Regions:
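Nucleotide-activated chemistry modules centered on ATP-dependent adenylation/adenylyltransferase
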Residues: 2-248
């Protein structure tokens, strides 16, 4: 169990990256990307860290292909440090990546957590073990305000995973994050940030991207209560995203 001291320090998590070198935990989704955006405005990025599935082909958190993750990193101009891990070995591998980042000059880990205490405490514990500070620029922000800021800044993200047991539909896969979708999700009783795992996104463009990340949608895959949109990097440079569903 995390100590009361850990939670008492939570307010500092918002600003710990200011003026400091940081490494960002990167899922490829909207929250980690928005946190990276804010941290880049005040701190000095040294890279991104990603934990992959055991085979090393997809990210452990969002199931994003390694080629797409690396294309995102290239688009924002940062190196990415990735390592494969099972769920059982996840913490050990994550701490190893943090220690590697520290050797390269990082002082703080930046994450896109909003308000899940378990997530905040876990990141607090592993950063302490690695000798780093913790920065969470989005911590305790209003969910609707956060996703609307993401849209208004010009980021573009597509839904790639949905939890069918939490009100999401298979037909939601492939939709862009827009103000209209935010309104619709709220009307359906769904958190527009998907903070509890209702859905995951893939960011393909935005103000910190030097160019869009070209992806191609392939097929929908069902796995129990989840549905996934299989995607791949489009080496030809096309963009398989419907213009009519782009954010304003």
């Amino acid at each position: 169990m995390e100590s009361a001291m850990d939670m008492a320090e939570a307010p500092n998590w918002k600003h710990n990256a200011c003026g400091r070198k940081f490494v960002a935990s990167f899922s490829g989704g909207k929250d980690s990307t928005l946190a990276l955006y804010h941290a880049m405005n005040t701190g000095k990025p040294v890279g991104l860290i990603v934990v992959m599935e055991e085979e090393g082909r997809r990210s452990r958190s969002h199931g994003i292909p390694e080629a797409v993750i690396r294309a995102q990193a290239e688009a924002v101009g940062l190196p990415v440090h990735a390592a494969p891990a099972s769920w059982e070995a996840y913490e050990k591998v994550f701490i190893g990546l943090l220690e590697q980042a520290k050797r390269q000059g990082a002082e703080v880990l930046v994450t896109g957590d909003l308000d899940m205490p378990a997530h905040g405490c876990w990141h607090d514990r592993v950063t302490r073990r690695a000798g780093l500070g913790l920065g969470m620029p989005l911590w305790e922000r209003d969910h609707v305000e956060t996703v609307r800021e993401f849209i208004d800044l010009g980021f573009q993200a597509v839904l790639v995973t949905v939890n069918l047991s939490m009100g999401m539909r298979e037909a939601d896969l492939g939709r862009m994050i827009t103000h209209e979708l935010v309104d619709e999700l709220a009307a359906r009783g769904i958190d527009p940030c998907g903070e509890s795992g209702e859905f995951h996104t893939l960011v393909i463009d935005g103000p910190i991207f030097r160019h869009p990340v070209p992806v191609r949608k392939r097929e929908v895959v069902r796995d129990g209560e989840y549905a996934f949109l299989s995607i791949e990097l489009d080496e030809a440079g096309g963009q398989d995203v419907p213009d009519s569903d782009r954010g304003r």
